[in-house]
């Protein structure tokens, strides 16, 4: 299912480092027109400009994509590597460690099968509800934003005029009661992010009829198909500890950002890029365990700055 929809030039540079930038550029769209902030009457308040110009890192600054396509591309390429093994559908249940190894016990409900793996280091990239993160500790730094949004991903049919007339850029409706973000992902896909109010009946709001009544301001039901409708609680938090007993966190396991800057997945990929060379150096006896600990010292200030900025952008909405 689609989740993230945006990455930046630094992430494309990381994709280039693993020889995937050319493939990924073919399934992505450059964000040339930025984000338009409008009032309740669609008057433009501000434009955060986009561009197709190549930036300092050798790539355009903003890219939009369909996450299932990107995940398939990454997985297909990873499976070509001799040292890559995947076990899909397993959930971590217990983590143990000694001075030399980490042991991970997982279970697949669909296969009704237990799996135990032993490793030198375990990297927990298991998302916002991370069991690995809980193992390391629950202390967080909270920057205060906690808001519910309904995220709607639609596949649209461009044969209809109401779809053709949609803007080819992202629009932020700065409504003080119910902010709405309309994202232009590609010619075939659009996203709406709608704030849920305390007075809303969430079960009613999630019904198909209610969703289409809301979307009717912009599109007709016959011209689009809802691929996903999901309630999210947007948070602005970062774990205080990312490392314990040979277990390391990366991505949403370590931090959660509101999506208002499109930097959530970017932060996770930066984490992995900062961690990968350290793990390789350690495995080749060129780095010490202290160099792995320094991973958090490198990433924490950068991630926390972006989370705080995203929370501030949320206030503008």
Residue ranges and their predicted role:
Residues 35, 84-85, 247:
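Short, conserved active-site loop motifs that form the nucleotide-linked donor/cofactor pocket
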Residues 36, 76, 121-234:
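Conserved FAD-binding catalytic core of PHBH/FMO-like flavoproteins
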Residues 39-42, 50-57, 72, 76-81, ...:
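Helical substrate-recognition/capping region of FAD-dependent monooxygenase/halogenase enzymes
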Residues 111-121, 125, 244-246:
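Core beta-strand elements of the Rossmann-like FAD/NAD(P) dinucleotide-binding domain
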């Amino acid at each position: 299912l689609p989740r993230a929809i945006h990455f930046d030039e630094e992430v494309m540079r990381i994709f280039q480092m693993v020889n995937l930038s050319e493939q990924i550029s073919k399934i992505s769209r450059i964000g040339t027109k930025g984000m338009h902030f409008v009032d309740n009457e669609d008057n433009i308040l501000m434009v955060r400009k986009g561009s197709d110009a190549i930036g300092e890192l050798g790539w355009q600054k903003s890219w939009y994509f369909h996450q299932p396509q990107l995940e398939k591309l990454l997985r297909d390429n990873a499976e070509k590597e001799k040292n890559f093994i995947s076990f899909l559908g397993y959930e971590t249940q217990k983590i143990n460690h000694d001075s030399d190894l980490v042991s991970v016990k997982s279970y697949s409900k669909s296969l009704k099968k237990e799996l135990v793996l032993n490793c030198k280091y375990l990297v927990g990239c298991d998302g916002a509800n991370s069991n690995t993160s809980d193992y390391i500790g629950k202390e967080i730094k909270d920057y205060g934003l906690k808001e519910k949004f309904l995220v709607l991903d639609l596949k649209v049919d461009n044969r209809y005029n109401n779809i053709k007339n949609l803007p080819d850029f992202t629009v932020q409706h700065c409504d003080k009661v119910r902010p709405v973000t309309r994202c232009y992902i590609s010619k075939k896909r659009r996203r709406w992010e709608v704030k849920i109010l305390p007075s809303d009946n969430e079960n009613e709001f999630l019904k198909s009829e209610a969703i289409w009544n809301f979307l009717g301001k912009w599109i007709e039901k016959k011209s689009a198909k809802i691929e996903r409708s999901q309630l999210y609680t947007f948070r602005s938090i970062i774990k205080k500890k990312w490392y314990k007993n040979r277990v390391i966190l990366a991505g949403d396991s370590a931090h959660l950002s509101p999506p208002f800057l499109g930097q959530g997945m970017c932060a996770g990929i930066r984490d992995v890029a900062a961690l990968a060379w350290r793990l390789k150096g350690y495995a080749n006896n060129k780095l010490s365990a202290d160099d792995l600990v320094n991973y958090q010292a490198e990433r924490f200030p950068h991630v926390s700055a972006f989370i705080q900025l995203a929370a501030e952008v949320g206030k503008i909405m």
